[in-house]
Curated annotation (Swiss-Prot):
Stated family: Belongs to the TRAFAC class translation factor GTPase superfamily. Classic translation factor GTPase family. IF-2 subfamily.
PANTHER family hit by this protein: TR-TYPE G DOMAIN-CONTAINING PROTEIN, TRANSLATION INITIATION FACTOR IF-2-RELATED
Biased composition (Low complexity): 56-125
A GO term for molecular function: GTPase activity
Residue ranges of domain tr-type G in the record: 218-387
Annotated stretches, region: G4: 327-330
Subcellular localization(s) per the UniProt record: Cytoplasm
Region G3: start-end pairs: 273-276
Name of protein: Translation initiation factor IF-2
Keyword GTP-binding set for record: yes
Length: 716
């Protein structure tokens, strides 16, 4: 005899298979799924619980079920009694059953049929009560009709009907936009709340500023020194370092890690050792906001110079306070007042003149005024109330990075919040790792670093970029997963942005000596056109670059053509042919330049102009949709009507169109009429049918593709 499976046993008792599985697990029985067979001893143990529950539940059921249970019990107890007595009891019970039926309505009769096997329903409800509609639901972008119906506890057909009344034809898998969702929710009186999906691979989310953190404590200010070349930025940095660092570290060797810390009046200050604003701008371009205070160095004998203005603009865009250090005041030709006067034109007005900008006269060479500058930095930092929480997981920014021959990839980091520890799992930029060693700006090995502390770490898998952000994760697997995902995404992005040749950048690459040959793939509608075009292109004579035909063929542009163009760094010219869907996707992904023409002269002129650096297109063709001709109708005085189904994008009334048959362009012109049912339509979207007539063209056949396009003006 075959053994009874879990789901069969559950069905017999009218309970869920999960309840049986849970009970078996409580009995220390390993269960793989509901198809597992039960042993006899397991069934006996389960019977003790579930049969007893069933018996208790049945005593609470309606009159009919009570009599039925009593009949079963009597039959079990009186097995040895005479059959006629058993029949009498049976009749008595049947009478009771009939009486119970007469006292119940039709709805209960249906439930009695369902309960004929003595199922253990606790409440003996006649039917499952409909769930109450919630007053508020949350949704994700792209929610479908079916998913919305589940959230509202209603049938999806109800939503589909409402959409139909709103003029929207939809099915259960149709995605709903926010406007449609609001209409439906308003109709049902339900409040909507959009769920924000957090992308854990986006490191910027870990840098979001929270409300006032009660555990935050004061942290050192991070200072960047900027200014014009030869105005004394490096000398000022060296002077501060020599005065405050080397003097306090007898015999100590300062490790160059792109930043260093000093202590002044009992408070630490972190200086970014990146003179100039190139690195500063690079960091800001990558979203890194690391600087708290900017020091603008201006030579007293030279005044405001072009790079000074550039530095002022960078500081303003970064929205950080600026302290002006008027350097070289010990020179005979120094004129600090002239510097102040010139800087007022750029919004930097000295406090002495009623402004808010602090000016500090100093000499980086002699050290005069250095203490005053450090004091002003401390005052500005105090006003800013710079705080951070050292008890959090560390986050921060890469200052510098290099590939060391002995240690592998090394990165100088600035901790902006939290505490960085040796052994932490880190994601930095598009790489990850586990911190193996950590060195401070004095070359000392340390085990932890708090906010605003610059350190150099090793243990990461690759070299990050300056300005990349880093985040510490408790779980090493999570750090690995996020790091690998970010690396993969960056590789894909680099492929998409690979510098393939196009007619737009051809002349630029020629000037840089990067282009010697222009590789061309030609696809045409007939062999004669292909040969004529190839011969014409070979005759183009421009100094510095040769046209090289690497492939010619007849037919539509396909994916293998794009692959060849990408591998050979070439362009594709289509003459009276179009790319198929796969070729379009591949060209966009690989950034391959495709040029489609119908006149040979235009091809020659375009390529020759590009090679001479004269190419200046003002408009670009943009395909907006395709429709497949399903049926044609010939109407007198109208012409051929193409009954079409929009397969991609949309067809608009004012768009240009071309008729494509077997990948060959037959005609290019304009729409005459566009109708949806009997009404004129401005546009017909994907998934809908429409009637189309083409101006001055009636040779439309079933299976033809109508491609709609617009000419879009592009910036050069």
């Amino acid at each position: 005899m075959s053994k009874k499976r879990i789901y069969e046993y559950a069905k017999e008792l009218n309970v869920k298979s999960k309840e049986i599985i849970d009970e078996l697990k409580n009995m220390n029985v390993e269960v793989s799924n509901h198809m597992q067979a039960l042993e006899d001893d397991q069934i006996k143990t389960l019977d003790k619980k579930f049969r007893q529950q069933e018996s208790n539940n049945n005593t609470k059921q309606n009159t009919q079920n009570n009599h039925q249970k009593q009949q079963n019990n009597n039959n079990n107890k009186n097995n040895n009694k005479q059959s006629n007595k058993g029949n009498a009891n049976q009749k008595g019970n049947n009478n009771n059953k009939n009486n119970a039926k007469n006292n119940k309505n039709n709805k209960n009769n249906k439930n009695n049929k369902n309960n004929k096997n003595n199922k253990g329903n606790k409440n003996n409800k006649p039917a499952a009560e409909p769930k109450e509609m919630p007053s508020k639901i949350t949704y994700e972008e792209g929610i479908t009709v079916g998913e919305l119906a589940d959230k509202l506890n209603i049938e999806s057909s109800g939503i589909i009907k409402k959409l139909f009344l709103l003029g929207i034809v939809a099915n259960i898998n149709q995605a709903l936009d926010e406007e449609t969702l609001e209409l439906i929710a308003d109709d049902y009186g339900v409040e909507l709340e959009k769920e924000v999906v957090v992308n854990e691979e986006d490191l910027s989310i870990y840098f979001d500023e929270e409300e006032a953190d009660p555990d935050a404590i004061e942290r050192p200010a991070v200072v960047t020194i900027m200014g014009h070349v030869d105005h004394g930025k490096t000398t000022l940095l060296d002077s501060i370092r020599h005065t405050k660092v080397t003097a306090g570290e007898a015999g100590g060797i300062t490790q160059h890690i792109g930043a260093y810390q000093i202590e002044n009046a009992g408070k630490k200050i972190t200086f970014l050792d990146t003179p100039g604003h190139a690195a500063f701008t690079t960091m800001r371009a990558r979203g890194a906001q690391v600087t708290d205070i900017t020091i603008l160095v201006v030579a007293a004998d030279d005044g405001v110079m072009p790079q000074t203005i550039e530095a002022i603009n960078h500081a303003k865009e970064a929205n950080v306070p600026t302290i002006v250090a008027v350097n070289k005041i010990d020179k005979p030709t120094a004129n600090p007042d002239r510097v102040m006067q010139e800087l007022t034109e750029y919004g930097l007005i000295p406090e002495d003149w009623g402004g808010e900008t602090i000016f500090v006269p100093l000499s980086a060479l002699s050290g005069e005024g250095i203490d005053d500058l450090l004091e002003m930095i401390g005052l500005v930092a105090e006003v800013q109330e710079l705080k951070a929480n050292p008890d959090k997981q560390a986050v921060g920014t890469v200052i510098e990075a290099e590939l060391d021959k002995s240690r592998g990839p090394a990165a100088s980091l600035l901790v902006q919040n939290g505490t960085l520890n040796v052994g932490d799992s880190i994601v930095v930029g598009n790489t990850y790792g586990r911190i193996r060693a950590m060195v401070n700006d004095l070359g000392q090995r340390i085990k932890s670093a708090g906010p605003s502390t610059p350190v150099e770490i090793t243990g990461i898998n690759d070299v990050p970029l300056a300005g990349d952000r880093f985040v510490i994760f408790k779980d090493e697997k999570q750090a690995r997963r996020i790091g690998e995902a970010r690396h993969e995404a960056s590789v894909i992005q680099q492929r998409q942005e690979s510098k393939n040749v196009s007619l737009d950048n051809l002349f630029e690459q020629m000037k840089q000596g990067e282009m010697k040959d222009l590789n061309v793939i030609i696809k045409g509608d007939v062999q004669g056109s292909v040969e004529a075009l190839a011969a014409s292109l070979m005759k183009i004579d421009v100094e510095g670059v040769n046209v090289r035909i690497i492939h010619t063929a007849v037919g539509a542009i396909n994916e293998s053509d794009v692959t060849l163009a990408n591998a050979s760094n070439g362009i594709i010219i289509g003459f009276n042919v179009r790319p198929d869907a796969g070729a379009k996707r591949a060209a966009e992904a690989e950034n391959v330049d495709m040029r489609l023409h119908r006149v040979i002269y235009n091809v020659i002129e375009e390529i020759e102009s590009a090679m001479k650096g004269l190419l200046d297109p003002e408009f670009e063709e943009q395909v907006i949709g395709q429709a497949e001709v399903r049926q044609t109708f010939k109407v007198s005085k109208v012409g051929t009507i193409a009954g079409s189904y929009v397969t991609e994008g949309k067809i608009t009334r004012n768009a240009g169109v071309r008729i494509i048959r077997d990948g060959i362009v037959l005609f290019e012109g304009e729409l005459d009429t566009l109708k949806r049912f009997k009404d004129d339509a401005k546009e017909v979207a994907q998934g809908y049918e429409c009637g189309i007539t083409i101006e001055k063209f009636n040779d439309i056949k079933e299976g033809d593709i109508i491609e709609a396009f617009e000419m879009v003006e592009i910036e050069r």
